[in-house]
UniProtKB/Swiss-Prot annotation:
Its EC number is 2.5.1.157. Disulfide bonds: none annotated. Signal peptide: none annotated. S-adenosyl-L-methionine binds at T15, V65, L88, T107. It comes from Methanopyrus kandleri (strain AV19 / DSM 6324 / JCM 9639 / NBRC 100938). This is 16S rRNA aminocarboxypropyltransferase. One of its GO terms (molecular function) is S-adenosyl-L-methionine binding. It is found in: Cytoplasm. Belongs to the TDD superfamily. TSR3 family. Pfam families: Ribo_biogen_C.
Length: 169
């Protein structure tokens, strides 16, 4: 797994830097280092991640972009022409900064959720359990993650998501 790091976060609270220090992810500051065809977790697009992206993630890589939420629209543009950009379906954050907020996941929550949905459940659990609040993220979202994992296509993930959306979203 690769994190493109924008250096605009608080380094003490940055989950990507912590994951890198633990040897769990590769870190780069250069968009050119992201492999062509990689699956990029991008909260600004419409197409949802699903098992259909599993081969691309395995062969080309799974990528998150660690930047501040205020600047999230700036960083994905340069990759969009050559990578598969995917949004995660409805999930709730359990990290201390955004606890309880829908869809605003930390970088490591996003990567763990992606692993889970792509069918790498054990790897997702091992990865997120390295963080104090990781197991809480899984418990809070277990039913949703299981349902998304079972969906075969992006369209099906979106259909399944409808069941979990609170009224008005
Ligand atoms: C905006 S950064 C914030 C990072 C935060 N400062 C941290 O320390 O974890 C979170 C990144 O995780 C991924 N991500 C988070 N929520 C997502 C979602 N709902 N859909 C797709 N990707 C998401 C994206 O790559 C996003 O840029």
């Amino acid at each position: 797994m690769i994190v493109l790091h924008a250096r605009d976060c608080d380094p003490k609270a940055c989950t990507a830097l912590r994951a890198h220090r633990m040897g769990l992810v590769e870190l780069t500051r250069h968009p050119g280092d992201v492999p062509t065809g990689a699956v990029v977790l991008d909260p600004t697009v419409e197409k949802a991640l699903s098992r259909e992206d599993r081969d691309a993630a395995l062969e080309r890589g799974l990528v998150a972009v660690d930047c501040s939420w205020e600047h999230v629209h700036r960083y994905f543009g340069p990759l969009r022409r050559r990578c598969r950009h995917r949004i995660l379906p409805y999930l709730i954050a359990a990290n201390p900064v955004n606890y309880g907020k829908p869809c605003k996941l930390s970088t490591v929550e996003a990567l763990a959720a992606a692993l889970y949905i792509l069918g790498f459940r054990r790897e997702a659990e091992e990865f997120i359990s390295r963080f104090k609040w990781g197991p809480a993220f899984l418990e809070l979202n277990r039913e949703r993650l299981e349902a998304y994992r079972r969906a075969e296509t992006s369209a099906e993930v979106v259909r399944v998501q409808e069941e979990f959306l609170p009224d008005g979203l």
